[in-house]
Amino acid sequence: MFPLARGIQIPNLAMARDTISPMMFPPPVPEIPASDVDKAAGYYVNTLGFTLDWGDDQGGIAGISRGNCRLCLTNRSFRESYGNVGPILFWLNLESKAEVDELFLEWKTANAKIVSEPEDKPWMLREFVAADLDDNLIRVFYDFRGA
């Protein structure tokens, strides 16, 4: 057992690894609040280089993708039952510092809303931040601790 705060303990799963196969998760699909799904999708497609896979504002939800990154854009009526009001921030993990810089230049050239330029941070990430039309933030980064 591993002790946690206030005497709470969890079992030592390392001993059971020979018999338990951990479930592998696919990449998460963030839900991005949008005041208008069609306008938001237009920005993600025309400015940020995503593809509209399905949906529209009438249905309240749209799926977009770029490579292995998938996002859902949702309007207020779609979200009202559980209160995801936004804006939110999500992280986009790239494969190298060069990719971070390349994407920054691509988005800057396309007139994306850039919040901060690429910079090596003390926490060992190279990152920049962009925003969408509803001020949701996209933190683009590369973890260079082991590089």
Region locations from a protein language model:
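Short acidic/glycine-enriched loop/turn segments that link adjacent beta-strands
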Residues: 57-60, 121-126
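Conserved catalytic-core motifs of GNAT/GCN5-like acyltransferases
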Residues: 31, 51-56, 119, 145-147
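Vicinal oxygen chelate
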Residues: 27-35, 62-65, 81-106, 126-131
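Conserved acetyl-CoA-binding loop of GNAT-fold acetyltransferases
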Residues: 46-53, 109-112
